[in-house]
Amino acid sequence: MLLLRWPTFCCLWVFGLGQLEQTELSVTRETDESAQISCIVSLPYFSNTAIHWYRQKAKKFEYLIYVSTNYNQRPLGGKNKKIEASKDFQTSTSTLKINYLKKEDEATYYCAVWI
């Protein structure tokens, strides 16, 4: 079983302009399954905001992917089949999907907004 963790409140340092919330504390899945992590974004301009996803393993942060206004994901490092991101404009939520889970996917995952 693989354990994916993330904090309840995520990294948005905008001095009261908004909030990011990841409501689940952990997700456990079997190897080769998929896992989804959601991030609720409380910003007045969600539709125009790029949501960025990171993971932390052994005190090292890794940038994974971002999703912008037009639902297009912008992966780095050729991970577009392994890692996907999407936005739901009705619920102001971004979702990270990790496919084909492996032991090395165990990490703490973060969503972020650059202001």
Curated annotation (Swiss-Prot):
<dbReference type="InterPro" id="IPR007110">
    <property type="entry name" value="Ig-like_dom"/>
</dbReference>
<protein>
    <recommendedName>
        <fullName>T-cell receptor gamma chain V region V108B</fullName>
    </recommendedName>
</protein>
<dbReference type="InterPro" id="IPR036179">
    <property type="entry name" value="Ig-like_dom_sf"/>
</dbReference>
<keyword id="KW-1064">Adaptive immunity</keyword>
<keyword id="KW-0732">Signal</keyword>
<feature type="signal peptide">
    <location>
        <begin position="1"/>
        <end position="18"/>
    </location>
</feature>
<dbReference type="GO" id="GO:0002250">
    <property type="term" value="P:adaptive immune response"/>
</dbReference>
<dbReference type="InterPro" id="IPR013783">
    <property type="entry name" value="Ig-like_fold"/>
</dbReference>
<keyword id="KW-1279">T cell receptor</keyword>
<feature type="region of interest" description="V segment">
    <location>
        <begin position="19"/>
        <end position="115"/>
    </location>
</feature>
<dbReference type="Pfam" id="PF07686">
    <property type="entry name" value="V-set"/>
</dbReference>
<keyword id="KW-0393">Immunoglobulin domain</keyword>
<keyword id="KW-0675">Receptor</keyword>
<keyword id="KW-0391">Immunity</keyword>
<dbReference type="InterPro" id="IPR051117">
    <property type="entry name" value="TRG_var/const_region"/>
</dbReference>
<dbReference type="InterPro" id="IPR013106">
    <property type="entry name" value="Ig_V-set"/>
</dbReference>
<dbReference type="GO" id="GO:0042101">
    <property type="term" value="C:T cell receptor complex"/>
</dbReference>
